[in-house]
Amino acid sequence: MAKVPDLFEDLKNCYSENEEYSSDIDHLSLNQKSFYDASYEPLPGDGMDKFMPLSTSKTSKTSRLNFKDSVVMAAANGKILKKRRLSLNQFITDDDLEAIANDTEEEIIKPRSATYSFQSNMKYNFMRVINHQCILNDARNQSIIRDPSGQYLMAAVLNNLDEAVKFDMAAYTSNDDSQLPVTLRISETRLFVSAQNEDEPVLLKELPETPKTIKDETSLLFFWEKHGNMDYFKSAAHPKLFIATRQEKLVHMAPGLPSVTDFQILENQS
């Protein structure tokens, strides 16, 4: 048995299918305050149901807006009906305010989470099998084997590595080039390692074939990380959890100690 060669550099060139993600966030400096932070003072009696710039002089016909300024439409009860973001250093006149009031197609600004939308649309496409019949040894020199029932995995010190479970590791594309998603299938079977919740044993899920695209079944995917001589398998479905071993426990998901999340991948040369 020998350690598997480092494949990370070669795989970086395999991501030609990656999708680019472009943020539509406004090009404002991150240290600028949002226009939602504007402070509102009581409106004069003749200012209800009219547009007026905030924090400006009452005698000025044209005002320069600063970082804290925005334009609002206030109803008689003081409720803000409409807001518009303005460019920095933009002049605004009374005519501009009137145009905003008459704009029937003014866009309503709604809170949203680009990150959530981006993650929910994530797809992982199969690239190739990068390891055939490899063995996983943990930091205690225990090898992964099947438990007596055959339904789960466990770790044990072996004198004969032929008794260890052999895995085929398949790589998938990712929108993040810093991560390498993989699946772990028991060689010559249809059983794939599937992550569960913290401290729960990993499952062996039977599939008809290696998935070509994974979108919803992220429990089958693990981000393979390499630090020094050790390998780690972080769950795509539970990003804080790793495949782990522990004395008198089945192979399970854990964030770290007292469980062991450090492995070495041994290549089968028999």
Curated annotation (Swiss-Prot):
Protein name: Interleukin-1 alpha
GO MF annotation list: copper ion binding; cytokine activity; interleukin-1 receptor binding
Gene name linked to the record: IL1A
Transmembrane intervals: none
Propeptide: 1-112
Modified residues (N6-acetyllysine): 82
Glycosylated residues (UniProt): 102, 141
Lineage, top ranks: Eukaryota, Metazoa, Chordata, Craniata, Vertebrata
Chief localisation class: nucleus
Family according to the record: Belongs to the IL-1 family.
